[in-house]
Amino acid sequence: MRPTFTSSHRGGSGSPLVCLHGFTDTWRTWDLVLPALERRHDVFAPTLPGHAGGPSLDRPFGVNEAVDALERMMDVAGLTSAHIAGNSLGGFLALQLAARGRATSVVALAPAGGWRRDDPLFSDAIVEHFTAMQELARAAAPYADSIVASAEGRRRATEFITTEFEHIPAELIAHQICGVAACTDVGPVLEVAVRDGWELAAERITCPVRIVWGSNDKVLPWPSAAARFREEWLPHADWVVLDDVGHCAQLDTPLEVAELIG
């Protein structure tokens, strides 16, 4: 069955919370934590521009353009500020929004951009990973339902982003495969990221920040991918390392992540 992609999710009641997904993902990466979060929060989870279900792109976006787009989305949603949680690229964008004064707190799960500037091989590895991942996803997407019908298929489909997969619904894994395949402009967006680099005006962040990292992250390995956050940008943040957890902690250990978001 071909999945349906939507531009955002809104649900729950309480203090406002914005949840931001990672590169090539969609808002549904938060599916497993939403029930717990929506008991305490008015949750707004948008899909980023250029991603499956999200706004189309006139040109490949960089970080500033992505943050501009998220500010517009928050404005339309009636959110002047909010608690913000983000994974990977979404974690980095959450911190950028905090630097613009739009966050009352941030929980960043394995945020992107924290590797050392003098490590070009890291950037090259990220580009190669996402390029290869999308090629695989596009080849697999027509067969996604068949792939996730077996435990081995579900394990292989999630092995780079989680260490545990048994609790993740097959339908959600199939949606993830097809979402990666449908993400537009992966190559050009990565080129912009490499060209522009990753910078954070951390001195402008005045809200509480918690950074969460899985010790078994295969996409942004701990601790090398966190170097600039730990040494330069946010050494005094509340740091949490989750043992034997992968890159997408919200999928790997959803109950623990819901508690960490608060």
Question: Which role fits each region the language model picked out?
Answer:
Residues 9-56:
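Conserved HGGG/HGGXW glycine-rich cap/lid loop of the alpha/beta-hydrolase fold
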